Amino acid sequence: MSAPCHCKHAEELTDTFSSSSLSYTNGKLSVLSPELQAEFQDPNHPANLICELCRLFYDNNWVTGTGGGISIRDVDGPNPNLVYIAPSGVQKERIQPWEMFLVELPDERIIRTPNDIPKELTKSYKYKPSACTPLFISCYTMRDAGACIHTHSQHAVMMTLFLENEKEFSISHIEQIKALPKLKYNEETKKIEKIGSMEYYDKLVIPIIENTPHEEDLTDSLQEAIKNYPGASAVLVRRHGIYVWGETVWKAKVYNEAIDYLLELAVKMKLAGIPLVKE
């Protein structure tokens, strides 16, 4: 991976706020604390990783027109219950680390918003929480995920159109399936556990849920799909896109890339009249 964001926000922070100390005005951060400086300059911090991945996903045509979203749980930090979420309505290729919403699990309490950050950085823009937030939270609470990705991949949308009357997408006997985890529900722990990786002969099954006028209204359907498909690491949303999660941000990235590859291939197979599942 290259340095996050491919921009100079870290240097700008050092130049502009190197002597800042923490203070509040009417409950808002009025100057940038040393802690926030360190956070925004750490290339492996979740806020910076979201920026890096947003730019990569934008280049892949997955999050254009402010669509899509990414969230990362700080699994390696002092508080693994903290979740960083990209805001709603921002251009993903220009997103900055200080634009994230910070939510704490399990009570979903908002710890920090971009509106708490000094206006020198945010230019007085009024940020809104991502409409994907309740869906991201569902992935964290139901699957103990470390990251959740939502894209508007055209391959995902096209495949749900090919399967207009179907409730799931299936494909088998494709090498790329090996990149995805083999999951199983543990009756004793009542949790989904990874028992290895999928194999060439395995059949990948991803549930499809129906789209709704508002993103947050997808929550119940997403939760139902997660419950009914314990072996899935993703949920397709018809005529909309896909949600993908993983135990870490890098696993989620790999799963998303592998699934998108399989969806693109599946679209071509459909057009060529080739069955997606080999008997």
Swiss-Prot record:
Catalytic activity reported: 5-(methylsulfanyl)-D-ribulose 1-phosphate = 5-methylsulfanyl-2,3-dioxopentyl phosphate + H2O
Top-rank EC class of the record's enzyme: lyase
Cofactor note text: Binds 1 zinc ion per subunit.
Any GO BP annotation: L-methionine salvage from methylthioadenosine
EC number: 4.2.1.109
InterPro entries per the UniProt record, alphabetical: Aldolase_II/adducin_N, Aldolase_II/adducin_N_sf, MethylthioRu-1-P_deHdtase_MtnB, Salvage_MtnB_euk
CC per GO annotation: cytoplasm
Pathway note: Amino-acid biosynthesis; L-methionine biosynthesis via salvage pathway; L-methionine from S-methyl-5-thio-alpha-D-ribose 1-phosphate: step 2/6
Keywords tagged on the record: Amino-acid biosynthesis, Cytoplasm, Lyase, Metal-binding, Methionine biosynthesis, Zinc
SUPFAM superfamilies named in the record: AraD/HMP-PK domain-like
Cofactor(s), by name: Zn(2+)
Entry binding sites for Zn(2+): 150, 152, 240
Entry function: Catalyzes the dehydration of methylthioribulose-1-phosphate (MTRu-1-P) into 2,3-diketo-5-methylthiopentyl-1-phosphate (DK-MTP-1-P).
Family: Belongs to the aldolase class II family. MtnB subfamily.
UniProt protein name: Methylthioribulose-1-phosphate dehydratase
